[in-house]
UniProtKB/Swiss-Prot annotation:
PROSITE patterns: RIBOSOMAL_S4 (PS00632), S4 (PS50889). This is Small ribosomal subunit protein uS4. Part of the 30S ribosomal subunit. Contacts protein S5. The interaction surface between S4 and S5 is involved in control of translational fidelity. It comes from Methanopyrus kandleri (strain AV19 / DSM 6324 / JCM 9639 / NBRC 100938). Residues 106-170 form the S4 RNA-binding domain. NCBIfam families: PRK04051.1, uS4_arch. GO terms for molecular function: rRNA binding; structural constituent of ribosome. One of the primary rRNA binding proteins, it binds directly to 16S rRNA where it nucleates assembly of the body of the 30S subunit. With S5 and S12 plays an important role in translational accuracy.
Length: 186
């Protein structure tokens, strides 16, 4: 089995630390997706880079094993919701066209915000970390969790969360009502 080595770093830092255009782009993405640290963004960029490198390797190969690996890569990215085309219709060029925003859209934090369970991406992050969000019966506390197509419909408030109650003040605000209006209706 061998000796365990240091775990591989999951992200690569930019080659140059002070490129104004890149810094502005990163700031825009961090604000849009509610990221706390650039390391989170770099982790997703590195993952995307690895998928693209894999696609380039598979483009050059023509053996039957490469075809099986292509299908597995297409299936994986389709199941994660990153590729829009079905695995049978997808091409390696589709993988090469992916952007980091395609990956960021699949984060649990982003999906909670897009489904209207939170008013802002940062509130979505807080709800995830504070155990208010569940996927099916399973509470997930990792905002960067990549939600698959299957799981996307199951994202909701945790059954153990006080937010599950329709009359909770945060849910009333998300609907555009004040908690007082809801109480007055009853």
């Amino acid at each position: 089995m061998g000796d365990p080595k240091r775990p591989r770093k999951k992200y690569e830092t930019p080659r140059h630390p002070w490129e104004a255009e890149r810094l502005e782009y990163e700031r825009k993405l961090m604000r849009k997706y509610g990221l706390r640290r650039k390391k989170e963004l770099w982790r997703h960029q590195t993952q995307l880079k690895r998928w693209r490198e894999r696609a380039k390797e598979l483009m050059a190969r023509t053996d039957p094993e490469a075809q099986r690996e292509r299908e597995a890569l297409f299936r994986k990215l389709y199941d994660l919701g990153i590729l829009d085309k079905k695995p049978e219709e997808a091409t390696l060029d589709d993988i090469l066209r992916l952007t980091v925003e395609d990956v960021l859209e699949r984060r649990l934090q982003t999906i909670v915000y897009r489904k209207g369970l939170a008013k802002t991406p940062l509130q979505a992050r807080q709800l995830v970390v504070h155990r208010h969000i569940a996927i099916g019966d399973r509470i997930v506390t990792v905002p960067s969790y990549l939600v698959s197509r299957e799981e996307e419909e199951e994202v909701d408030y945790s059954p153990y969360s006080p937010l599950k109650d329709e009359d909770h003040p945060i849910r009333c605000e998300a609907r555009g009502e004040s908690p007082e209006e809801t109480a007055a209706e009853e």
